[in-house]
């Protein structure tokens, strides 16, 4: 007889083959049509709000793996918090002004860009940005990221621009904004000032030269400086010495050179000289001494500075206040002239004399040659070092003194207030606090003006009569109200008299004759105002619960946001900050087109599905740098298959089960009580990991639970009961009750990580209380399901089971058995406690070990296990053709001559 029809074989439409690439778009359509995101807010309208504020990516290209990972991590948070019962609005945003976009537009125009008016360039920039907003929006949605995609915040929207100006007005009112002629990072290619957050450091080869400056009062004595920027020597006005260092005068041939004693040996070895020390003195003894400039007929004065170090060079620092922040500060102290004879394109101006018209990088060679010819050059070489580059064009930048607008970070103790706010924030990982604190402590004033057109104009006006440049709160407010209606294009389209209040007069001379200025705001101010434009002004809870971005944002968005929020609102804009590292390839190298190791996230999605990409994100310890490559993604495909098969097993064995079939805990079999107890521990552990943003631990614990605890133990053991026992028997319903709770918890736990698969499983299950799993609530830990004594007992039984499995494997290798059901296992536990435990659970040991018979015995000679001695023999009796177990009484039932007594009872309907 074919007994297959008498078994409760698994049934489900949840296929083993995922086919995510085709199914996921259908799921997205389902979520959209059913308005699931909107319903998550409606069903939790009266619940506490949890706000993760989205840091806006630049709308200047397709998403890359880093932006994909960032949005997926945010989606883990918002989906989890929604299931925890919070109202979780998520408004995605885009950064749409600034150099990255303008650079792309002007580069594509080539020479045509110079023929375009500012208004025309701005129109093209807007079109470009909005095009990529739409492209990125669809890409993020395809990743399964939920949010208010139809109503994102976009920094070029007039309402958003209004709030930028409103925050800026507060800073001006507070006196934190000033105009100064001081050195700033300047990109000669992009022809604009840059802030610290717009600087990248790359290796760069520079000249390395030692130059001697002749003392005016002692023509045979020279102070030796070292520099890697010969092009700044035309702007030199001083030489800085440390006041407390010991300096030496050394005799070299017929000359005397002055260098720091602490660098003497290194210097002498580098330039290859023999010398004799003739005098020692401290730096402050030379203060005020004059030297002759090596290129021009003027003098350079000796000044003192604490920043002089003994790391490199000579301890005598070439000082050009027009080309360095520290030099500038020293210049203020000594009232030195600020020379910066370089124009916007990095060419020398007429103030540089013979070098006029030369680009600074080309001038290096010419200046070194001139120094050599006039006898001032001691040695010239090359040095490879980390040098600042523009974040957009990737070219080297310079420090250049130009009139710019700045935010003073110390006025009104703003820096001090920000440092206090930093302490109140929870940082993940904890070192984030140390990092941003150090950056804030050391940062200079914020250069906020840009010599570009694609941005929010700084509404400063210049008096045509006296030349005074004025930035007044009432002008900003007047312009902001215009912007609310017409956007910032108004600055480029309207007459200046329409942009200022009718009664506004020049504070310096009383004139009403003005012209517009043309600087725009640093784009970091745009995004740094998002807390006001998107959250606070809309009446949402403030400060928000979380900012989550790459760890480069400690000097970017986190810093701009906390400075602006502290200045305007008196508080940090966030309660917690989570940062992630950067993506590297499988060898740990940075991803770059030149290495050919860039991975497009949409290629992964289109080949494997978004859930595979999301699973990879969950697998990473994202607080550090993250590796990815083909092999790593393939590993996730295999892990996904295991998770999917676990879900499939659970679903396929609950096909005839409803909540009406649930058994009360006290009626469950011991093994099922153990499974439910372990489930509660798992839920408790996973919840802690989700709360701490430890998704790699969620991933590892879930994979381990599914593969080790479920598939390799519990689910394997259950097959006999599920398939063979009577459909409605307590044996099967007890198992199904446990599977019900496991499936329910597992689907919910996986929902934030792999939302498509979780939804598919939910829709195929008997669990549907809502339209979508993403409207469900997080599984609660049910303490009544935890029997600590029973859990401890099964921990010991599992250890004995390991010994049994080893013995079975040995027996299989020795051809004593083929399948474990061929076995009769004889066990001798190694201590009295374990012997008593085996006696207590003797009736379930055959099921637990998946064998036909278990005998507890003494003094056996089998496998010497760690916890038990185990002897494996071939089971006696005939093999039951229904359950495949061996039993001495198989075949004695005339009605069912091929079955064991248990199966005969099931077939007769006698085993309930």
Swiss-Prot record:
Q: Which GO terms describe its cellular component?
A: cytosol
Motif 'KMSKS' region covers: 590-594
**Chain positions recorded as Zn(2+) binding sites:** 880, 883, 900, 903
Kindly list the cysteine pairs connected by disulfide bridges.
none
Q: Any idea of its EC number?
A: 6.1.1.5
Q: Which residues bind L-isoleucyl-5'-AMP?
A: 549
Give the protein's cofactors: Zn(2+)
* Pfam families tied to this protein: Anticodon_1, tRNA-synt_1, zf-FPG_IleRS
Stored InterPro entries: aa-tRNA-synth_I_CS (IPR001412), aa-tRNA-synth_Ia (IPR002300), Anticodon_Ile_BEm (IPR033708), Ile-tRNA-ligase (IPR002301), Ile-tRNA-ligase_type1 (IPR023585), Ile-tRNA_ligase (IPR050081), M/V/L/I-tRNA-synth_anticd-bd (IPR013155), Rossmann-like_a/b/a_fold (IPR014729)
EC class name: ligase
Motif range for 'HIGH' region?
57-67
Q: Which UniProt keywords apply?
A: Aminoacyl-tRNA synthetase, ATP-binding, Cytoplasm, Ligase, Metal-binding, Nucleotide-binding, Protein biosynthesis, Zinc
Q: How is the cofactor bound?
A: Binds 1 zinc ion per subunit.
Tell me its family: Belongs to the class-I aminoacyl-tRNA synthetase family. IleS type 1 subfamily.
What NCBIfam families does the annotation carry?
ileS
Q: Which HAMAP family match?
A: Ile_tRNA_synth_type1 (MF_02002)
So what does this one do? Catalyzes the attachment of isoleucine to tRNA(Ile). As IleRS can inadvertently accommodate and process structurally similar amino acids such as valine, to avoid such errors it has two additional distinct tRNA(Ile)-dependent editing activities. One activity is designated as 'pretransfer' editing and involves the hydrolysis of activated Val-AMP. The other activity is designated 'posttransfer' editing and involves deacylation of mischarged Val-tRNA(Ile).
UniProt name for this protein: Isoleucine--tRNA ligase
What taxonomic ancestry is recorded? Bacteria, Thermotogati, Thermotogota, Thermotogae, Thermotogales
User: Which gene produces this protein?
Assistant: ileS
